[in-house]
Amino acid sequence: MKVNTNIISLKTQEYLRKNNEGMTQAQERLASGKRINSSLDDAAGLAVVTRMNVKSTGLDAASKNSSMGIDLLQTADSALSSMSSILQRMRQLAVQSSNGSFSDEDRKQYTAEFGSLIKELDHVADTTNYNNIKLLDQTATNAATQVSIQASDKANDLINIDLFNAKGLSAGTITLGSGSTVAGYSALSVADADSSQEATEAIDELINNISNGRALLGAGMSRLSYNVSNVNNQSIATKASASSIEDADMAAEMSEMTKYKILTQTSISMLSQANQTPQMLTQLINS
């Protein structure tokens, strides 16, 4: 039996340190809910989780981008829907004004409303915007001819969607079914029967053009909607993978904490007894 060095006490102190360290680690994991709280816990796992977290935050941002893109396209589509409704009313007026039994004087009541509807078409085309970006007037300074959406967390992964230049229908030319052309809607008139007939045919082409424009916007919204679903699913899968690596098993950690708590208490008791060994030897020698 050694007297100068209390080997049992030293070993017990080391066990006590390890048990206390294990209990502290289990308590930290229970408190944070994470198995990895520092690189000391799992350096490789922490590196993987960090990359996964970066990817998932990028995917979440891409989902928001696509959702904003859908909002933008819905704004443009809603405005085109209003323009289509206005054109339908203008067509109704043109058809009524085409009636040969009306005099030019009789048509004045249609002309006034027809002119005000032309102004409203311009108003819709001029003022429709999203976040101060002109959507239907590509002649404006802050106009957009195409919207580019960052589709994922990868650089330059863009979805490009062309916008419809509704303002161009105002001063441009309209090709009729006969092959002839007329000026844009701003020049249409129902002042007489011939003008009303021409306006009716022109409005049919305008409505068709706007319908085609809305179809393009609808296709863009559909694509963005699928992209939102895709990146959301990727983000969920990435977060689940990170969770399986990083998050603590609460039941297992509770069991670990209980185990180390018991071992720590036992180590303290054993250390107390080990420290009494020299005193017992002294008493034995004295006796």
UniProtKB/Swiss-Prot annotation:
Keywords from the named record: Bacterial flagellum, Secreted
Tagged with keyword Cell membrane: no
GO cellular component: bacterial-type flagellum; extracellular region
Classification via Gene3D superfamilies: f41 fragment of flagellin, N-terminal domain, Flagellar export chaperone, C-terminal domain
Pfam families assigned to the protein according to its UniProt record, in alphabetical order: Flagellin_C (PF00700), Flagellin_N (PF00669)
One of the record's GO molecular function terms: structural molecule activity
Top-level taxon in the UniProt lineage: Bacteria
Localisation: Secreted; Bacterial flagellum
Classification via InterPro entries: Flagellin, Flagellin_C, Flagellin_C_sub2, Flagellin_N
Biological function: Flagellin is the subunit protein which polymerizes to form the filaments of bacterial flagella.
Family of this protein: Belongs to the bacterial flagellin family.
Protein name stated in the entry: Flagellin
Gene name of the encoded protein: flaA
